[in-house]
Amino acid sequence: MHCPFCRHPDSRVIDSRETDEGQAIRRRRSCPECGRRFTTVETAVLAVVKRSGVSEPFSREKVISGVRRACQGRQVDDDALNLLAQQVEDSVRAAGSPEIPSHEVGLAILGPLRELDEVAYLRFASVYRSFSSAEDFEREIEALRAHRQVPTSS
């Protein structure tokens, strides 16, 4: 790796540690030319393939932005949005594929969002699933009610 200070084409790794709950590796490096130290962070690239076929890196910020629009006017704080984005990223990474269709990202958002805020879930689902009638909303509300009534095992 090039030194960011003197642009020497090599550096030596001094220390490596996992960060971000094992999703990244933080490396402390030293330049043999100028002697300065710097830190790098390595993560595995996860690409999202859009409907058009274009591929772009997965972005937690885009997940948060989309969910924030659905949560507008609701009592949902930034910590909850960040946690949801982390859950979505963990879910899509667990698929084990370096590329994932954007449709799968949307599906990964729905579950955690339903648990976070049902109104925001309905808003997001209505756009994501292209609701076109009141009946679409009614069906989704019935599904929400049924989900609420399923007993959870302790």
Swiss-Prot record:
Pfam families: ATP-cone, Zn_ribbon_NrdR
GO molecular function, one term: zinc ion binding
Zinc finger (unnamed): 3-34
Manner of cofactor binding, per the entry note: Binds 1 zinc ion.
Gene Ontology BP annotations: negative regulation of DNA-templated transcription
CC cofactor: Zn(2+)
InterPro entries reported for this sequence: ATP-cone_dom, NrdR-like_N, RNR_NrdR-like
Family the UniProt entry places it in: Belongs to the NrdR family.
PANTHER family: TRANSCRIPTIONAL REPRESSOR NRDR
Function: Negatively regulates transcription of bacterial ribonucleotide reductase nrd genes and operons by binding to NrdR-boxes.
NCBIfam families: transcriptional regulator NrdR
The protein, known as: Transcriptional repressor NrdR
Organism field: Mycobacterium ulcerans (strain Agy99)
